Amino acid sequence: MKKEEKINYFWKYVLLTVGGILILIPLMVTVFSSFKKTKDIMNHFFAFPNPITLDNYKRLLADGVGGYFWNSTVITVLSVLVVMLFIPAAAYSIARNMSRRKAFNIMYSLLILGIFVPFQVIMIPITVMMSKLGLANMWGLIILYLTYAIPQTLFLYVGYIKLSVPDSLDEAAEIDGADKLTTYRKIIFPMLKPMHATTLIINALWFWNDFMLPLLILNKDSSMWTLPLFQYNYSGQYFNDYGPSFASYIVGIITITIVYLIFQKHIIAGMSNGAVK
């Protein structure tokens, strides 16, 4: 290895190490603080909890965090399932017909235009519309998530199919007597596994951690709050008592971290191939 390459690798490792430390320190402080009393947090912010206490988590359970956790779980699971059921099929149809029919190119271009529209531009009209339609509830929030998930998810699936799923598979299946639905269900859909994992993680992270849409749609009815919305109001309730707030953050982190660890091996392949058109 040349001297210049060694220097480049050295600085890359330095930057990665520094970046890792900057990410891990706040996470470590959050975990430690969730097991401390507030006076210990104030006096020994970076120290390991001594003694370890579960009082913050007990108070969190007593304050009904389970209900808000359930709300977030239902919204996230239903939204992800619908996205992964319909968008891959739409992407397959578009990817296979873009080169043959101009209408599919136009349709695809219109659908992915949403990527370039900032949410802040349509935030107020969307809120007013959902309220007037009587959809200022969990079902309305799911509909909005599905709508906003279409552009990015469709873009990734179409790119992945065009790059990694050759047309010859369709032709071979047709020769064997399979119709389009059978071809998609038994051949194409299983081959999209890396992209399924990628879109699952991307959308689940967004749906689970999103704060702005629940604030706009669900804030009037506390029984429908999601976990991030509960954390926001909970932090305000315990403004001078940091322990329960830190515990609520850990509850939100653990679930999505587990999902990420399960599917992480497929994410890089899905992102790298799906981003290439």
UniProtKB/Swiss-Prot annotation:
GO terms for cellular component: plasma membrane. It is a multi-pass membrane protein. It is found in: Cell membrane. Its main location: membrane. The keyword Transmembrane helix applies. GO terms for biological process: transmembrane transport. Disulfide bonds: none annotated. CDD domains: TM_PBP2. The chain crosses the membrane at residues 13-33, 74-94, 110-130, 141-161, 198-218, 243-263. PROSITE patterns: ABC_TM1. Residues 69-263 form the ABC transmembrane type-1 domain. Keywords: Cell membrane, Membrane, Sugar transport, Transmembrane, Transmembrane helix, Transport. Pfam families: BPD_transp_1. Belongs to the binding-protein-dependent transport system permease family. MalFG subfamily. Involved in a binding protein-dependent transport system responsible for the uptake of melibiose, raffinose and isomaltotriose. This is Multiple sugar-binding transport system permease protein MsmG. It comes from Streptococcus mutans serotype c (strain ATCC 700610 / UA159).
